[in-house]
């Protein structure tokens, strides 16, 4: 997953470079041995490494069992495909992970303007780990997409904007990728398949710089106006477009870099799922990796409303009271 090189001073005063490797092993992708069927009773864990050509001394730092809230979305995002479940080969070409400021120091930098959360103790203040969820694809076929999802429960009716930082880079299997080779896909809805809003934003390749703006280029920042989400449903209904098909707006501002679509009847008052994905826009299989960070709502509408009770006594000449 990651590699870090450090300079170590030996006892004789010489300096030697040492490499540290971080591995993440997907537990549920293993091969059952001797009839084990589940993870309900795990008593021992053994780790071994093989295929070394010479004696090697390894220093083992820590072994952690970790989990995440994001899950791989095992269905296709292509609305034209009837068989929506991905097959075994398609499930092998993408994975979900995480990069953080503590475990990936040097290769990871927090987004501009974002500060690490502080845990206030009785005598000390501890900085929390700042991290991003990652989606990596390997030889993703042309015009195909892969995604991850998370279950939520939020109401965005009182907010004006939806924002997020994104980072695109080639992974270890990619020779090179270019700007707009990948698009980010963000879906928010009441369910994963039939009622959702979709945003698609072409991504620029992040540079190899060391500043936050290099790692998180402004062109990749999502800045969506939530008021247009309701407007696109009205636009679709006026055209008598089927609500069971994905409708893409044709009347949005041309200066807006993202494309907004809707399917079904989602509502910002009850969002239950978020889908984050990446789509191959080229005509050939390519590999890449996207980091998603700080998906957030902004611009809270705090304007008060009006309420009144009226009691009137009117006299209309000699006709009525």
Where are these predicted regions, by residue range?
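Extracellular/surface-associated beta-sandwich interaction domains
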Residues: 1-321
